[in-house]
Amino acid sequence: MWSKEQVLAGSYQELSDCLMDLLKYEMVGIILDDCTIGLVNKMLENTQLMLDNIDEFEWSDVMKVRQSNYTAIRLINTLLINQYDKIFTHKR
């Protein structure tokens, strides 16, 4: 069985990877709302805070944060998929 730390660390890594994807899109000229990047940064901070104080949180808290992170990742991936046309047009 996974520990609370392992679950949150995995969620943190997935969210961090998502932020890197967002930044890569900006490097090729896709303009994203600053709020999107700010939101992911804030979620990373909150997940790290929870990791740093893991003994103060119940499993239900960990799972809520994990689910929130996963939902944000899915929404951002959808946003990025919708930007593919702009990316391929930019590369031509």
Where are these regions (language model features)?
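Short terminal alpha-helical segments
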Residues: 1-28
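Short amphipathic alpha-helical heptad-repeat segments
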Residues: 8-15, 35-48
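Alpha-helical and His/Cys-centered functional microenvironments
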Residues: 10, 17, 52, 71, ...
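Charged, amphipathic alpha-helical oligomerization/scaffolding segments
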Residues: 14, 21, 42, 68-71, ...
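A structural signal for well-ordered alpha-helices, especially hydrophobic packing surfaces
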Residues: 19, 23-26, 47-51, 73, ...
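Charged, low-complexity interaction regions
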Residues: 27-34, 53-63
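Amphipathic alpha-helical binding modules
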Residues: 62-92
